[in-house]
Amino acid sequence: MLEINNLVAGYGERRVLSGISLTLKNGELTSVIGPNGSGKSTLLKAIIGVVQSSSGEIISGDRNLLSLSYRERAKKLSYLPQGKPLPDMSVRQMVLHGRFPHIEYPRKYTARDREIALGAMQKMGVDSFADSPLSSLSGGMRQNAYLALCLAQDTEFLLLDEPTTYLDIKNQLSLMRRLRSLAEEGRGILTVMHDITLALNFSDKIAVLSGGNIVFYGTPQEVLKSGIIKTVFDVEINNDYSLKIKK
């Protein structure tokens, strides 16, 4: 379990997160939704240490992750940003980068590292492209390769920033089913979602973020009943989690 308590973070003098508290449980997929500029991406960056936190704590086991180095934190948390580079390397080479937090410099991969990387590629369905250039993959398969990189870190928790962006609906659904499967295997998954209906259909819990604060947290059914979607987004959701389209 990952407990985030009263986390305050931002950029220089500009505060973006104002005392965020959230619990991420193993075996659950938690989605963060909210308007643009509400602090969704900043929340993930603050958890992994890319954005500095001015106060609060992030507890895993008996340790406050804020006291750990970025590398030590990467042994516990995998992070996939929304904007990703396209390195000039094979899928296998990129996925092996997920082992970096676990190996010393100069980096030499062990048989165990290669085994873990292969298992990650197999789980995400990209092992048949292992020696292909990453740039040769379709958008959906490329995203699966990036997720394999995260899995190769061998962490309990995955933090994903809008992982379905730029994917067509078929690949969006395929990716969300894979995330559900990973959660059911015991991983805790925290994902920023732009698509409210995907969040409602695939999440165990949803945190609604607005103005740097969590204004509602609960199951998809609780979110739907609360009316918070109408309040925050000015849209209405049907009982089947589809959007009500105004004509």
Q: Where would I find each of the regions flagged by the language model?
A:
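The feature captures the beta-strand-to-loop junction immediately N-terminal to the Walker
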Residues: 33-35
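ABC ATPase nucleotide-binding domains
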Residues: 230-247
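Conserved ABC ATPase signature
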Residues: 108, 133-137
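Helix-to-loop junction immediately C-terminal to a conserved catalytic motif
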Residues: 48
